[in-house]
Regions:
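Short, flexible/disordered secondary-structure transition segments
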Residues: 111, 135-139, 169-177, 281-289
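Non-catalytic C-terminal interaction segments of nucleic acid-processing enzymes
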Residues: 42, 46-51, 58-67, 150, ...
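Short amphipathic alpha-helical segments embedded in low-complexity Lys/Glu-rich regions
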Residues: 117-118, 141-144, 176-186, 289-295
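Short Cys/His-based metal-binding microdomains
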Residues: 116-169, 250
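Extended C-terminal regions of large enzymes
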Residues: 1-113, 120, 124, 330
Length: 369
């Protein structure tokens, strides 16, 4: 079996060397194609080929599973939780990591899974009495958790993470005339050639371009906002409102934390809720923009969230850092909600959030000679 795999990998490696493909946006002929690689380079190509086959078989097998393979469908519309070695070692604690991993393959100890495994005779929800208490029910669909403010607390936690980043971004726009930091135009240079011309700086165009008097309002459950009356008198309250009187422009951002399989439906629902408000604002002479932010209950960040922050003019590095922070916050809050699935006294269990996010420090060698 090993000989067959190696021979197949060697054949595919030869095909990759004879018929190389161009990756990225560099253009044809910009890559470094080595027709006669060394033995170490051939070994790396063969290893990458075998690893690619293994990954394809793993994903194909996971997709065929009814319960454990649902996570393969989320990768098309959401960015997964950060499982890098750095985050696993120095990031959240082992309990949170175990919860996120088990939630992806539907192996969390929920009442329905305990009944399936034969540990309990029923699968009732301890809070609302639902006859089938799944992980989806605990995280996003329990009426008692909704009325008790657990989902609202998670929602406010995400808003409190976004607010300082947006404030810092708006303050940075005051020093930029074009509404954001400049973009560097990348010039691709072949090996051995010199840069023909210096890289040009192109202004970043975003929804916040052209003004520096932007104001920000964030709607919390305990601190509700009033929609700016100079724009329009309405009782609707988007989660985040950014507006400029000089440009007569407003940007509304709506946040939701649905289940990963319902991210697209949640986005369409939020857009439909505020479409009429957007039209009313445009009728009074203002320019309105409507964006959505979706973070799955297991920590998967929708790609539309990244596009939202990019449309605001944020740099890619800051967008990536913010998305990781949002993913971790939602995962911590969902873990706290899961731990309190049997406790109706929610106010006394909010300290679970701190226990779920204690960063682990490197273990010091305490051996004595």
């Amino acid at each position: 079996q090993i000989i067959k795999v190696l021979s197949a990998a060697e054949s595919e490696t030869k095909l990759r060397l004879l018929f190389p493909t161009q990756d990225g946006r560099a253009g044809l002929g910009a890559g470094n194609f080595n027709a006669s690689p060394t033995s170490s380079e051939q070994r790396e190509l063969m290893v990458s080929t075998v690893v690619g086959w293994s990954d394809e078989e793993h994903i194909a097998h996971a997709s065929s599973l009814a319960l454990q393979g649902t996570w393969t469908k989320w990768s098309e519309q959401a960015r997964p939780f950060d499982f890098s070695w750095k985050n696993l070692i120095y990031g959240p604690g082992p309990h949170l990591i175990r919860f996120v991993l088990n939630s992806l393959i539907n192996c969390v100890k929920t009442p329905d899974m305990l009944q399936l495994w034969g540990y309990t005779p029923t699968a009732f929800c301890s809070l609302c009495g639902n006859d089938k208490c799944t992980l989806h029910h605990i995280l996003v669909n329990c009426n008692c958790a909704l009325v008790g403010g657990r989902y609202t607390w998670r929602h406010d936690s995400v808003l409190s993470t976004m607010e300082p980043v947006l404030k810092a971004h708006l303050s940075s726009l005051k020093n930029e005339k074009d509404g954001g930091p400049p973009l560097i135009e990348k010039s691709f240079v072949r090996k051995g050639d010199n840069l023909a011309r210096p890289a040009k700086l192109a202004p970043r165009k975003s929804l916040l371009s052209g003004s520096t008097d932007w104001k920000l309002l964030v709607d919390y459950s305990d601190r509700p906002i009033v929609f700016p009356p100079e724009i329009l008198a309405t009782s609707q309250r988007p989660d985040i409102v950014i507006w400029s009187i000089a440009l007569k422009k407003v940007v509304m951002i709506e946040l939701t934390c649905p289940a990963e399989e319902g991210i697209e439906a949640a986005r369409e629902r939020k857009l439909g809720r505020y479409t009429q408000l957007k039209q009313d604002i445009e009728e009074v002479g203002w320019t309105a923009g409507l964006l959505t932010v979706e973070v799955g209950a297991r920590g998967y960040v929708a790609y539309s969230t990244e596009r939202c922050f990019r449309q605001l003019g944020m740099q890619k590095r800051k967008v990536s850092s913010l998305c990781k922070s949002l993913s971790r916050v939602v995962a911590r809050c969902s873990y706290a909600i899961y731990l309190s699935r049997k406790n109706k006294d929610w106010d006394k269990n909010r300290e679970l959030l701190a226990d779920a996010d204690v960063p682990r420090q490197p273990v010091q060698d305490q051996t004595t000679t």
